[in-house]
């Protein structure tokens, strides 16, 4: 199966559009979170992967998730997930949906990974650079440390990854030399 984020994106975008239209963004986010929790269960996964089970049975199982959204739209979404065998991407759909909600609120979530922990001055500099890069948006900054980067930073937000690490530069050089 294709990368789950890639598979999830059109579903998340369509659901977000529907939710926004009806003013039920949070209710849909909650429903997706509950659905992802159910699908994470080993027994539910066994049921959903059982080739002897009809799609209607699988939709019925997933319909047991209590939701505060339009039931007809919810069941249509579940039927689509089952029919297209996209239920494994449910957690990613929920994540992308939540990302869309935050973007609509003007917030960009950014993960900054560095080889060593950033000091206060470095954090301020990175935060300022990110706010310039994402002008008009509030930047929610998270930090991680990965010594394998050797030095520099990797900045990740949504589909955008900026690899300014020593490891990334070495890998790029190796690819260039091989070609």
UniProtKB/Swiss-Prot annotation:
It is a peripheral membrane protein. It is found in: Cell inner membrane. Signal peptide: none annotated. Transmembrane segments: none annotated. GO terms for molecular function: proton-transporting ATP synthase activity, rotational mechanism. InterPro entries: ATP_synth_OSCP/delta_N_sf (IPR026015), ATPase_OSCP/d_CS (IPR020781), ATPase_OSCP/dsu (IPR000711). Keywords: ATP synthesis, Cell inner membrane, Cell membrane, CF(1), Hydrogen ion transport, Ion transport, Membrane, Transport. One of its GO terms (cellular component) is proton-transporting ATP synthase complex. HAMAP family: ATP_synth_delta_bact. F-type ATPases have 2 components, F(1) - the catalytic core - and F(0) - the membrane proton channel. F(1) has five subunits: alpha(3), beta(3), gamma(1), delta(1), epsilon(1). F(0) has three main subunits: a(1), b(2) and c(10-14). The alpha and beta chains form an alternating ring which encloses part of the gamma chain. F(1) is attached to F(0) by a central stalk formed by the gamma and epsilon chains, while a peripheral stalk is formed by the delta and b chains. F(1)F(0) ATP synthase produces ATP from ADP in the presence of a proton or sodium gradient. F-type ATPases consist of two structural domains, F(1) containing the extramembraneous catalytic core and F(0) containing the membrane proton channel, linked together by a central stalk and a peripheral stalk. During catalysis, ATP synthesis in the catalytic domain of F(1) is coupled via a rotary mechanism of the central stalk subunits to proton translocation. This protein is part of the stalk that links CF(0) to CF(1). It either transmits conformational changes from CF(0) to CF(1) or is implicated in proton conduction. Belongs to the ATPase delta chain family. This is ATP synthase subunit delta. The gene is atpH.
